[in-house]
């Protein structure tokens, strides 16, 4: 590709999905430019690596580009997209560019409605511990690497495969993981769940005859598609028929202790430096792949025990002073679908037994809030105290029956929790100050702007000291 394409421009380069690909291309020696609406730590990092960053979208930003990379979040009337079309510069979807990177190495693609980022990070970490030095492109910041992407010298590239816009069908990896299949982003599939499941079947058809589909048999929807997968299947999970399964699971001190049972191998005692049964399942996917690729058991054990996590995935910010003179534990999480949220709440209960759980939640997208309204009410009713914000629109038009006020009224009608509603996410720190008590576990949660709240809370605390 390099002898034809020398300069590549990214529209929305600061996004999690775009920035990782951009970083790998910079490290491969391409000239990379990009634009975004505001600066952040990601754009600063890319600029330090040599990328040319512009703040704001303007036709002049694509000067000299041989290709313009966009995601489905970029509107067709974006001035840079219009300029590229006018100048005859190829407009490339993000997933297509990721597919080009996979052509350079052997691809390991992690798919599923929930758990992609953590599973991708675990796979990359375990393979790195085994000396395979993989390239990785992750939708979140791998804390141990300080980045969401890295160019390795090994044969493999590990990346997330996004089903939200069906773009994962552009990828042709040699190993695929399917963590689960749930009803999300249903507008892509005409609100037809059968079409969503069919897309995952088609995803497995991208595998070569020597490839493998590593699938979680604990998920009933994944189990249903297994008979339609024509390539070799490796089953993992907690179920008795899993070829790589966990037994003797014990949650202690925020870690998961369990024994891995693999066909033809001795049992392996593992300590995972993450809480929650869902993370045991994510780790099993990494163990299955690592075992297949010849990573030693010692390396697997070390990588999982030392795993530092991913930014915004049950990320601990430590102890914060509470208004009553004590301290509470502050955690941030990206969960925005009721299934993910329930898993995180369960993980928090297991990691901090007997402690009061306070949640500050920002719903993400009006359509998701509408489609999963009852499920949101159910999972939010399981916490001890709740601060609720208005929905983060993500470009959608407001829906009066699926906004923060409607959710608050529904929660009060159930009567298990009385939410403190704030119209703006900027008001969350003050609202939490009035709710959190000594010994509480406080989780900020959502896929929108609430991700900046924990740092503000910590900053406010430091200014008062």
UniProtKB/Swiss-Prot annotation:
Gene Ontology biological-process annotations: cell division; cell wall organization; peptidoglycan biosynthetic process; regulation of cell shape
Subcellular location: Cytoplasm
InterPro entries per record: Mur-like_cat_sf, Mur_ligase_C, Mur_ligase_C_dom_sf, Mur_ligase_cen, Mur_ligase_N, MurCDEF_pg_biosynth, UDP-N-AcMur_Ala_ligase_MurC
Gene3D superfamilies assigned to the protein according to its UniProt record, in alphabetical order: Mur ligase, C-terminal domain (3.90.190.20), Mur-like, catalytic domain (3.40.1190.10), NAD(P)-binding Rossmann-like Domain (3.40.50.720)
Secretion signal span: none
Binding site for ATP: 112-118
GO molecular function, one term: UDP-N-acetylmuramate-L-alanine ligase activity
Pathway connected to this protein: Cell wall biogenesis; peptidoglycan biosynthesis
A GO cellular component annotation in the UniProt record: cytoplasm
Entry's transmembrane regions: none
EC number(s) from the headed UniProt entry: 6.3.2.8
UniProt superkingdom: Bacteria
Keywords: ATP-binding, Cell cycle, Cell division, Cell shape, Cell wall biogenesis/degradation, Cytoplasm, Ligase, Nucleotide-binding, Peptidoglycan synthesis
EC main group: ligase
Catalytic activity: UDP-N-acetyl-alpha-D-muramate + L-alanine + ATP = UDP-N-acetyl-alpha-D-muramoyl-L-alanine + ADP + phosphate + H(+)
Recorded family membership: Belongs to the MurCDEF family.
Function in brief: Cell wall formation.
The protein's name in its UniProt record: UDP-N-acetylmuramate--L-alanine ligase
């Amino acid at each position: 590709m390099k002898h034809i394409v020398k300069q590549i421009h990214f529209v929305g380069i600061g996004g999690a999905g775009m920035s990782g690909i951009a970083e790998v291309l910079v490290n491969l020696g391409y000239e990379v430019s990009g634009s975004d609406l505001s600066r952040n730590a990601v754009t600063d990092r890319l600029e330090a690596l040599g990328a040319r960053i512009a703040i704001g979208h303007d036709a002049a930003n694509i000067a000299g580009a041989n290709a313009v990379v966009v995601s489905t979040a970029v509107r067709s009337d974006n001035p840079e997209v219009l300029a590229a079309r006018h100048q005859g510069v190829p407009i490339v979807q993000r997933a297509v560019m990721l597919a080009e990177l996979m052509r350079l190495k052997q691809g390991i693609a992690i798919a599923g409605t929930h758990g992609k980022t953590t599973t991708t990070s675990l796979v990359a970490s375990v393979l790195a511990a085994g000396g395979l030095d993989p390239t990785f492109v992750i939708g979140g910041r791998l804390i141990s690497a300080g980045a969401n992407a890295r160019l390795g010298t090994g044969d493999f590239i590990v990346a997330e495969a996004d089903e939200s816009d069906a773009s994962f069908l552009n990828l042709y990896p040699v190993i695929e993981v399917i963590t689960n299949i749930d009803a999300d982003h249903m507008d892509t599939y005409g609100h037809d769940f059968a079409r969503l499941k069919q897309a995952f079947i088609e995803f497995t058809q991208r595998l070569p005859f020597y490839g493998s589909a590593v699938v979680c048999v604990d998920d009933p929807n994944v189990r249903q598609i297994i008979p339609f997968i024509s390539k070799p299947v490796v089953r993992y999970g907690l179920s008795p028929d899993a070829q790589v399964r966990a037994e003797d699971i014990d949650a202690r001190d925020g870690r998961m202790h369990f024994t891995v049972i693999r066909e033809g191998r001795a049992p392996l005692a593992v300590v995972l430096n993450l809480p929650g049964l869902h993370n045991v399942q994510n780790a099993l996917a990494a163990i299955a792949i690592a075992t297949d690729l010849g990573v030693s058991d010692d390396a697997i054990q070390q990588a999982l025990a030392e795993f530092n996590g991913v930014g915004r995935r049950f990320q601990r910010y430590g102890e914060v002073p509470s208004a009553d003179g004590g301290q509470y534990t502050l955690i941030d999480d990206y969960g925005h679908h009721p299934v993910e949220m329930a898993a995180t709440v369960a993980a928090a209960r297991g990691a901090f037994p007997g402690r009061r759980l306070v949640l500050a939640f920002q719903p993400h997208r009006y359509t998701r809030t509408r489609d999963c309204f009852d499920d949101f009410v159910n999972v939010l009713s399981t916490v001890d105290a709740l601060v609720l914000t208005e929905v983060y629109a993500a470009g959608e038009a407001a829906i009066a029956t699926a906004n923060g006020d409607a959710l608050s009224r529904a929660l009060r009608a159930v009567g298990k929790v009385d939410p403190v509603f704030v119209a703006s996410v900027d008001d969350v720190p003050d609202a939490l100050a009035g709710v959190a008590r000594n010994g509480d576990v406080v989780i900020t949660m959502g896929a929108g702007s609430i991700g900046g709240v924990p740092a503000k809370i910590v900053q406010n605390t430091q200014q008062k000291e």
